[in-house]
Amino acid sequence: MVCIKSSCVVKPSEPTPNVKLFLPESDQVKPWTHAPVFFVYQPEVDNSVSTSLENLKFSLSRALVPYYPLAGRLNGIGGGRFELHCNTMGAVIIEAESDARLEDFGDFRPTSETTKLAPYVDYAKDVSELPLLLVQLTRFKCGGIGIGIAMSHIVSDGKGAFGFITTWAKINRGEKGIIEPFHDRTAFYKGDPTAKPRCDHVELKGYPVLLGNKSAKEERAKETTTRMLNLSKNQVDKLKEKSNLGKPKDYVGREYSRFEAMSGHIWRCASKARRHENEQLTSLRITIDCRNRLRPPLPPRYSGNATMVTTSIAESGELLSNPLGLGFVCSVIRKCIDKVDDDYIKSATDFLISQDDLTPYRSGFHNVGSTEGVFLGNPNLAITSWVGLPINDVDFGWGKPIYMGPTALGYDGKLLIIPGKDDGSVIVPIRLQVAHIDDFEKFFYEDI
């Protein structure tokens, strides 16, 4: 049980610009719901909750000076679009206690209990009333500490969010030398509403539905659950080796990556567990960081959303029975990733900015069971990799986190790839339908 003890608003400790920040289509198409994550710490010495809370409030107020947009609010401007008013309304910080021990949460898979470790956001309120950043400090019975963070996805992607979180942690440790973030969203291509798309943007046309169904309504209503799966470095390396053994004889490109091998393996296991017919179209939606794919590249400390999605589509039968096996699936994924270049990004942006209403194109809402946005569940998957994010740098003074992950996964088919310990292992939190999850886990390990 988690008991909320107090809550307060934290504002920047110094005056900050009172401006309305333009949000490009790369921001606009993201969900305005909050991505909930939490960090778990086991301090070596006993920490007073009140002292930790006061320190966090102070350091947060200082961190909100360079990251002043997070103290603002969204305002609707029509057409399913928003602007970001940097009005210093502030972030919210919450103090909580739990009568549980860290070991009671097992592998920390996203459940109704872990959801309570991140701040609750009341989506019954108008978007303009919602803080963009909420934080929850939870002290556990065993002395462990949890920091739950909920940040509106429409203002930042994972890399931008971690820029803020690591800055805040650094300030809380008493360190100096903060690197200033880059907030000017006009650096991302603004788009030309008169230009016609030059590429085939599968993800903007809609996603496959089950054969015999006219829509995803029936699948969206089915019960889902989560699992937390683990791959050792040896298992990941084995998948990579397996994928590269399946390359065509005339293939001359670079080796398939760990990410491509894991993604292909997961896609095959899902199609198998879902018992798709051979002719069933299935898609794998992948989130791509575009910072270095745009021309010119974005500044390294760009704080907004610089990701776009790209989608692979294939028949389930071919994924499972092609003679090249995992190598074939990786070739499909490779083509999907490699096409995301400067022209592809700008073509997608031109399409989005030409739409009168962006609402039909917004997806990935974080609240479990949401009926909003594009459905990415059966027969589809949506994958995001957090490998490469500086998770172990989030040290508030209690040492490195012993765990970091999501408190919730919003929908069927959603999964993450999270780095494990500093040994090349990974953790895969995934949400699937109850009818499919056991078989998926079985194939996930058996088919390596």
From Swiss-Prot:
One Pfam entry name: Transferase
Tissue and organ distribution: Highly expressed in root and rhizome. Expressed in senescent leaf and callus tissues. Expressed in detached leaf treated for 18 hours with ethephon, methyl jasmonate, salicylic acid or illuminated for 24 hours with UV light. Not expressed in mature leaf. Expressed at low levels in leaves and flowers.
Pathway: Phenylpropanoid metabolism
InterPro entries according to UniProt: CAT-like_dom_sf (IPR023213), Plant_Fungal_Acyltransferase (IPR050317)
pH dependence: Optimum pH is 7.0.
Catalytic activity: (2R,3S)-piscidate + (E)-4-coumaroyl-CoA = cimicifugate K + CoA; (2R,3S)-piscidate + (E)-caffeoyl-CoA = cimicifugate D + CoA; (2R,3S)-piscidate + (E)-sinapoyl-CoA = cimicifugate J + CoA; (2R,3S)-piscidate + (E)-feruloyl-CoA = cimicifugate E + CoA
Entry's EC annotation: 2.3.1.-
GO molecular function annotations of the record: hydroxycinnamoyltransferase activity
Any Gene Ontology biological process: response to UV
Gene3D superfamilies from the UniProt entry: Chloramphenicol acetyltransferase-like domain
Signal peptide (residue range): none
Active-site residues, as the UniProt record annotates them: 153, 395
Assigned keywords, A-Z: Acyltransferase, Alkaloid metabolism, Transferase
Similarity remark: Belongs to the plant acyltransferase family.
Its biological purpose: Catalyzes the formation of cimicifugic acids. Uses hydroxycinnamoyl-CoA thioesters as hydroxycinnamoyl donor substrates. Has a strict specificity for piscidic acid as an acceptor substrate as none of the various other acceptors tested including 4-hydroxyphenyllactic acid, malate, spermidine or tetrahydroxyhexanedioic acid are substrates. Donor substrates include 4-coumaroyl-CoA, caffeoyl-CoA, sinapoyl-CoA and feruloyl-CoA. No activity with cinnamoyl-CoA, isoferuloyl-CoA, 3,4-dimethoxycinnamoyl-CoA or 3,4-dihydroxybenzoyl-CoA as donors.
PANTHER family: SPERMIDINE HYDROXYCINNAMOYL TRANSFERASE, TRICHOTHECENE 3-O-ACETYLTRANSFERASE
Entry protein name: Hydroxycinnamoyl-CoA:piscidic acid hydroxycinnamoyltransferase
Organism expressing this protein natively: Actaea racemosa (Black cohosh)
Organism classification: Eukaryota, Viridiplantae, Streptophyta, Embryophyta, Tracheophyta
